[in-house]
């Protein structure tokens, strides 16, 4: 328990974007209800012409069969079996197809859905980091990115959703004017995805990992955990030179290392390849492991933007790749929303793993070959999924300008409300990079020889191998192609020529070919990169790979660089609830822990109806304490005695995860109190009436006594004084008796009043009594005068 959470959309309860979409996500009160599900299934199946015979569905005399690919390596085996059993109970015949990673991936992602080789698959995804603002929801829900059934392979059946494509492309390209507009678009995208639900999100898992007690230097990535690019770079055991890491797989048939890393459709589409490759390559830009904001890694940047509606002129000495004529052309005259200046010194003053110095030629060839696959008709036809994904981002690049001192300007038609995201979007240097000569040899094998493909779906559609630089057979073909290039004197000069500037030479190309060939012959793979470790050997059959520290003196980082210690994650500790009374304000105190100043967003839902009644933000009391305030107007609309759910999502700007907690409160019913007040009021009225009658009698007696005094003034002074004293004493006794009775009544009334919540009426009653006592006091004053 506690190592997972239910999912409704692809966002988890720990994602920052969950906060702004919490009302949408929680509006769908999904729950396990097989009876209700069967009712809906029965209605739809009969409407489609199916018959239920003996508890099983038939169509055209044949059982309705669902082909269910169930992964066996983890919890998905149990999830798959549970879902399959419920489908069988609902009347379907389920063909349970138990598979490990490789066969499952090939069946699902490398086949035309129209072949009906599968209908349901227990898909799973690993995370490589945390994002504060996700700009690419289309990767999971929109057809244009090639990661939906059909996989953008020409000739295959394709899932289509034009509105999802349009909205996710706008989000991807930054086509919004404010954060608020972006959030509205994101909410609409999630709603559309829920309505179609090609992917049904079930649960997110919180992984626990086992490590030696003496292992130190592990960085914390609150989104990726041990999958992070950062985690192992500074890890060590004191006194030992080696680290042995356990992984479920080092290689599967889906584990593909190739230079065309494009979202989820090129190389590196599985966690098993990515986890290893991250140790061998340095990104230019990465994601902060706490905040989820893009940060410089092996480059630095400066951002200048004209905003969502402004423009910046692209200078004539900026260039763009012309895929039709295969050359760099001036981009002068174009306009862009933003320009980012990157300093690539820490790349360009260092070496590749095979000893050749990294140069701008590597960057220029990489950018050009991506424009080629995106916009060259022949190449895009060979790699349609990769082309469709790349073209959307490359359309926004308006020019590249080479500056002195290893700096490169990138002009892009893109804006975001956080400049760091503009820099990330403009980044040309890929996370996983190889030298240009390896890319060139791979391109020739794909586009010229047509022996390999960069994408998994395209490889199956074309009937060729999916290029994998760590497999010995594939590496041998790359080496052979490099040898041809060396022999031919192959030199793609146009790739390196911008105006009058040329960034590579034929002699430099020949040296690169020879050095890369030597690497391939020695290591029996062609993964050459630039990170803190190099891939020394890879054995797919033995499921082992060996990575060795790259000790080249030109490598820019030293031990301790890029280390991120553990921090306190955001966690709600308690919710303090006040009494909620209709028509009165109410408060809830939220105490939490975590980095920085904490904030909360809350939601109130009617438990009986499921309706969301309020969504709002907390007030800050202290950095770790927040106050939720409900207005009298809001509470006046709550039903006395009803139960309501309070859902609180607490977050920090310093750590892009959230903590979600739920609690319940009821609303105080005032009906019993009102009945008690009514009873007390009646009793108070009756007693005051009795006291008034006693006082009237006393006053009448006093008047009679005074009259008697007047009539006996002719008596002797002693007799008069005696009679007056006797009469006054009699009146005094009667008044005292009435006063004592009144005092007792007051005490009784006070006791009753304390059992009610309406102090105001009691105060009014006491005020009336005070007036009466004043009258009594006035009546008693003549006695004192008479005795003077």
Tell where the protein language model's regions lie, with residue ranges:
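Extended alpha-helical stalk/coiled-coil segments
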Residues: 675-754
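Append "and occasionally in soluble cytosolic enzymes with long acidic Gly/Pro-rich linkers
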Residues: 1-85, 89, 188, 231-233, ...
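C-terminal membrane-anchoring or membrane-association module
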Residues: 772-788
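Extracytoplasmic/peripheral linker and loop segments enriched in polar/acidic and small residues
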Residues: 1-5, 9, 29-30, 95-105, ...
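Short helices/loops that flank or line small-molecule/ion binding pockets
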Residues: 81-90, 103-118, 355
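Gly/Pro-rich hinge or "lid" segments in bacterial periplasmic/extracellular proteins
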Residues: 34-39, 252, 261-271, 278-281, ...
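Surface-exposed, Gly/Pro/Thr- and Asp/Glu-enriched linker/hinge segments
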Residues: 56-60, 103, 166-167, 184, ...
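Long beta-strand-rich cores associated with HINT superfamily self-processing modules
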Residues: 141, 145, 207-255, 259-270, ...
């Amino acid at each position: 328990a506690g190592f997972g959470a239910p999912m409704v959309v692809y966002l988890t309860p720990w994602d920052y974007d969950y906060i702004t979409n919490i009302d949408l996500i929680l509006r769908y009160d999904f729950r396990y209800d097989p009876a209700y599900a069967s009712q809906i299934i029965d209605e739809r199946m009969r409407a489609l012409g199916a018959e239920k015979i003996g508890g099983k569905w038939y169509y055209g005399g044949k059982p309705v069969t669902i082909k269910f690919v169930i992964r066996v390596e983890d919890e998905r085996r149990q999830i798959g079996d549970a879902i399959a059993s419920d489908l069988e109970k609902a009347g379907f015949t389920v063909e349970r197809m138990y598979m490990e990673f490789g066969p499952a991936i090939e069946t699902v992602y490398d086949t035309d859905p129209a072949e009906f080789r599968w209908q349901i698959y227990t898909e799973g995804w690993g995370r490589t980091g945390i994002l504060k603002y996700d700009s690419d929801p289309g990767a999971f829900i929109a057809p244009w990115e090639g990661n939906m059934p059909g996989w953008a392979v020409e000739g295959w059946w394709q899932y289509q959703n034009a509105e999802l494509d349009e909205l996710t492309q706008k989000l991807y390209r930054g086509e919004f004017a404010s954060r608020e507009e972006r959030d509205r678009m994101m909410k609409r995208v999630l709603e559309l995805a829920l309505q179609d639900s090609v992917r049904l999100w079930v649960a997110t898992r919180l992984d626990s990992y086992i490590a030696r007690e003496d292992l130190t230097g592990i960085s914390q990535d609150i989104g990726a955990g041990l999958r992070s690019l950062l985690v192992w770079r500074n890890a060590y055991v004191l006194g030992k030179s080696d680290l042995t890491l356990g992984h479920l797989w080092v290689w599967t048939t889906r584990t593909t290392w190739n230079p065309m890393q494009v979202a989820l459709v090129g190389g590196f589409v599985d966690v098993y390849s990515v986890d290893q490759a991250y140790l061998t390559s340095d990104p230019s830009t990465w994601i902060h492991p706490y905040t989820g904001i893009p940060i410089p890694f092996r480059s630095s940047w400066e951002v200048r933007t004209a905003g969502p509606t402004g423009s910046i002129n692209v200078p004539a000495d900026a260039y763009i790749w012309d895929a039709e004529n295969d050359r760099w052309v001036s981009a002068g005259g174009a306009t862009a929303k933003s320009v980012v200046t990157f300093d690539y010194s820490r790349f360009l003053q260092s070496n590749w793993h095979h000893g050749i110095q990294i140069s701008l030629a590597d960057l220029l060839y990489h950018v050009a070959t991506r424009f080629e696959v995106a916009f060259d008709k022949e190449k895009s036809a060979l790699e349609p999924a990769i082309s469709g994904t790349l073209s959307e981002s490359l359309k926004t690049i308006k020019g590249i300008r080479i500056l002195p001192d290893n700096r490169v300007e990138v002009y892009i038609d893109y804006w975001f409300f956080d400049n760091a995201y503009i820099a990330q979007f403009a980044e040309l240097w890929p996370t996983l990079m190889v030298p240009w000569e390896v890319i060139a040899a791979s391109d020739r094998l794909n586009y010229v020889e047509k022996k390999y493909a960069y994408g998994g779906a395209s490889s199956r559609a074309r009937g060729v191998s999916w290029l994998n630089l760590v497999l010995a057979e594939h590496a041998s073909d790359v080496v052979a192609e490099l040898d041809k290039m060396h022999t031919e004197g192959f030199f793609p000069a146009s790739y390196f020529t911008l105006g009058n500037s040329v960034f590579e030479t034929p002699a430099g190309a020949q040296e690169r070919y020879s050095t890369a060939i030597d690497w391939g012959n020695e290591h029996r793979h062609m993964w050459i990169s630039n990170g803190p470790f190099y891939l020394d050997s890879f054995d797919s059959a033995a499921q082992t790979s060996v990575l060795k520290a790259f000790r080249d003196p030109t490598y820019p980082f030293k031990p301790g660089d890029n280390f991120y210690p553990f921090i306190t994650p955001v966690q709600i500790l308690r919710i303090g609830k006040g009494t909620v009374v209709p028509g009165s304000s109410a408060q809830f105190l939220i105490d939490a822990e975590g980095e920085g100043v904490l904030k909360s967003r809350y939601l109130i839902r009617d438990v009986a109806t499921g309706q969301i009644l309020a969504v709002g933000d907390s007030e800050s009391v202290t950095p770790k304490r927040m106050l939720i305030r409900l207005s009298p107007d809001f509470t006046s609309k709550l039903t006395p005695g009803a139960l309501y759910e309070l859902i609180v999502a607490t977050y920090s700007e310093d750590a892009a995860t959230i903590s979600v907690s739920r609690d319940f409160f009821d609303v105080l019913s005032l009906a019993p109190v009102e009945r008690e007040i009514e009873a007390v009021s009646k009793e108070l009225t009756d007693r005051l009436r009795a006291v008034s009658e006693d006082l009237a009698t006393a006053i009448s007696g006093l008047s009679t006594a005074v009259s008697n005094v007047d009539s006996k003034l002719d008596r002797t002074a002693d007799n008069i004084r005696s009679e007056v004293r006797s009469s006054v004493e009699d009146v005094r006794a009667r008044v005292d008796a009435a006063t004592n009775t009144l005092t007792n009544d007051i005490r009784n009334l006070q006791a009753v009043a304390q059992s009610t919540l309406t102090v105001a009426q009691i105060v009014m009653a006491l005020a009336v009594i005070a007036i009466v006592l004043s009258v009594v006091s006035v009546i008693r004053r003549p006695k004192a005068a008479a005795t003077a």
